């Protein structure tokens, strides 16, 4: 009778722990959603205050911008120092059809006593529009930097095998969801061992400890696997979008590199601004017939390298020929 009573108590505690875990998981999930929404609202409000009253103009050979409601900021740059045009779309901007338009520029090295804000401005270049419709980008470039009006149009997509490689790279090798599932599985094994020891009497736990153990078990297993599944799906979607949208293009004057995904960035720069260009490949890429393109300009305080992974080997070799002196003729 005593063993039966103890078993009944243990079963009741496990059931109560399961119910408490379900409520706890629901509360935590709701809290995370609310927190994300609140952070997004504060981020949008901060951007509005930071870029309120934004103005951009072209004055002879200089591009000037000014913005800020609480702290007014003025930036100017000579057109000769402009190294690239950068179109950035965060996930939210992509959903809305908007982008951030900026210019990569040459910056002097910053000293140790420079402020963090100055370093950030140097790294991101000069923003010529913080929030603009994608279909207005050509119009703005024609008005502010007409020197960049002859951008290449015929894009060369990444190799077909890049989709498979991107899915493996982003969802497995560097996938947050996959490795979170591995960690949860290890925790599950540990909890299973502890539970087995408790059942055989190897580890003695009172009713309160057993209750807490049951809650922890359910939270980690259910919540961990659920989060891992969501992250895994996000990684796969990001990889598929990257493979579909990533490309590079060049003509007699310019090169353009696009890296897609849930967020997207397109960088365009003149051929004469490329200080160094090369291709590289690892053994897996050589087996797949792909190369990584790297083009370095003087943008920023120490130069900026734009990279595209898994271009086809034939396209990469043609691009190297274009980089050679006279290769754009």
Predicted regions located by residue number:
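N-terminal basic, Ser/Thr-rich segments that initiate or prime the first beta/alpha elements at protein or domain
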Residues: 1-329
């Amino acid at each position: 009778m005593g063993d039966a009573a103890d078993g009944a108590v243990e079963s009741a505690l496990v059931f109560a722990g399961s119910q408490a875990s379900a409520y706890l998981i629901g509360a935590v999930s709701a809290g995370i959603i609310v927190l994300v929404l609140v952070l997004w609202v504060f981020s949008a409000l901060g951007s509005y205050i930071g870029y309120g009253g934004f103005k951009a103009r072209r004055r002879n050979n200089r591009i000037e911008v000014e913005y800020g409601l609480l702290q007014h900021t003025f930036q100017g740059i000579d057109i000769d120092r402009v190294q690239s045009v950068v179109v950035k779309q965060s996930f939210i901007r992509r959903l809305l059809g908007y982008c951030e338009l900026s210019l990569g520029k040459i910056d002097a090295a910053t000293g140790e006593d420079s402020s963090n804000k100055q370093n950030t401005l140097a790294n991101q270049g000069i923003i010529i529009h913080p929030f603009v419709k994608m279909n207005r980008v050509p119009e703005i470039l024609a008005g502010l930097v007409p020197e960049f009006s002859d951008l290449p149009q015929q894009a060369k997509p990444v190799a077909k095998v890049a989709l498979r490689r991107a899915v493996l790279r982003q969802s497995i090798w560097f996938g947050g969801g996959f490795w979170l599932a591995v960690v949860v599985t290890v925790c599950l094994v540990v909890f299973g061992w502890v539970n087995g020891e408790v059942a055989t009497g190897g580890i003695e736990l009172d009713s309160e400890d057993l209750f807490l153990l049951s809650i922890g078990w359910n939270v980690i297993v259910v919540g961990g696997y659920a989060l891992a599944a969501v992250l895994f799906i996000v990684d796969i979607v990001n990889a598929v979008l990257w493979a579909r949208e990533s490309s590079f293009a060049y003509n007699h004057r310019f090169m353009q590199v696009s890296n897609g995904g849930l967020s997207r960035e397109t960088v365009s720069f003149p051929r004469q601004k490329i200080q160094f260009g090369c291709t590289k490949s690892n053994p897996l890429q050589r087996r797949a017939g792909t190369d990584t393109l790297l083009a370095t300009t003087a943008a920023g305080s120490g130069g900026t390298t734009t990279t595209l992974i898994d271009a086809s080997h034939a396209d990469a070799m043609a691009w190297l020929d274009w980089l050679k002196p006279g290769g754009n003729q």
